[in-house]
Amino acid sequence: MVRLFYFILLNFLILNFTNAKDISIGENLNLEFICELEKKIIKNSEYNYKTFLAEELNIKNLDSFQIYSNKPSTLMVNGLSKFLSQNSNLDVKIVNKDVVLFKAFNNEKTYSESAIITRKSGELIHEITKNINTDNSEKDISIYICKNKSKNA
């Protein structure tokens, strides 16, 4: 039930911030997590939001997922995906005492990645959307449980 709430919250926040650049960095962070994949939800031409447990997939866990933020506007993420690690222009950057939320688009606005991590529970939801604004858009939603390797949580 909690996961469903965060999934709905993530989609709500993403939909509300799609057309605007939103930056709210309220915390200075330097965090590193080890994250274990719990499940993946896939929506494409073959699957309509089908859920796969981690044991059913051949996907590596995240050995080093890093978040760095510095007030008022710096947020960098590394280790979640190549796209996010190489993208310094995140469209949405929100950091507060409870969550870290971020989203980035490619230049053509046909591909996006977003994620939200709840700092207290360590739950991470990572969403990849391909073919945005087409009839055959695809979503890949990964849900991880993360453990903090750093002390400044």
Give the label of every model feature segment:
Residues 70-117:
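Contiguous, well-ordered beta-strand patches that form the walls/edges
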Residues 109-131:
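A short, solvent-exposed beta-edge/loop patch
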